[in-house]
């Protein structure tokens, strides 16, 4: 995709695709920072890539998401470089749902089951909100509301 200064209407989808294309040119999926870590930095970005894919149907976007997840989740469904005691490392699990739906690959179900068990046992504050991390007692961070 080339970004030009023509008179084409610049819709939100136009800008979403421009952002996705830029990141895809800059980083191979498995190299998205922090490289080799199942983390919310990639999870939030790739959630946006998935929404862009849903709107425009460009299968390259779905393949990019799958490539990143497959670099973190092995054939047995084990997630490497994931701390289940941190919401930051649970957030990318949202990507596993569409991968399971579209591919039927059971590794994504096994990875989801692992994350579900972690979140069910995750510590909560008095109001029921999740602690940001197991080692941050009673701390509920704003981004944790999203995660």
Which residues fall in each region the model found?
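Mature N-terminal, pre-catalytic/accessory segment of carbohydrate-active enzymes
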Residues: 1-12
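N-terminal basic, low-complexity leaders that serve as flexible interaction/assembly modules and, when applicable
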Residues: 2-4, 22-25, 31, 37-44
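A short, Lys/Arg-enriched amphipathic alpha-helix followed by its capping loop at the start of a domain
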Residues: 12, 51-58
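Long, well-ordered core segments of solenoidal/helical folds
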Residues: 12-31, 60-80, 110-129
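Short, hydrophobic transmembrane alpha-helix segments
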Residues: 31-34, 54-56
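Well-ordered alpha-helical segments within folded domains of soluble proteins
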Residues: 38-54, 84-101, 140-147
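A contiguous, low-structure linker/loop signature
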Residues: 85-125
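Flexible, surface-exposed loop/gating regions in the mature catalytic domains
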Residues: 126-145
């Amino acid at each position: 995709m080339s970004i030009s200064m023509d008179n084409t209407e610049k819709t939100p989808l136009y800008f979403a695709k421009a952002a996705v294309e830029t990141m895809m040119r800059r980083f191979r999926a498995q190299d998205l920072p922090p490289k080799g870590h199942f983390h919310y930095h990639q999870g939030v970005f790739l959630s946006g890539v998935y929404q862009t894919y849903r709107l425009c149907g460009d299968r390259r976007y779905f393949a990019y998401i799958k490539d990143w997840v497959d670099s973190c989740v092995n054939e047995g469904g084990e997630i490497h470089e994931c701390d289940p005691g941190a919401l930051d490392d649970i957030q990318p699990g949202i990507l596993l749902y569409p991968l399971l739906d579209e591919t039927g690959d059971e590794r994504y179900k096994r990875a989801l089951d692992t994350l579900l068990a972690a979140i069910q046992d995750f510590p909560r504050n008095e109001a029921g909100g999740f602690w940001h991390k197991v080692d941050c007692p009673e701390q509920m961070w704003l981004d944790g509301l999203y995660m």
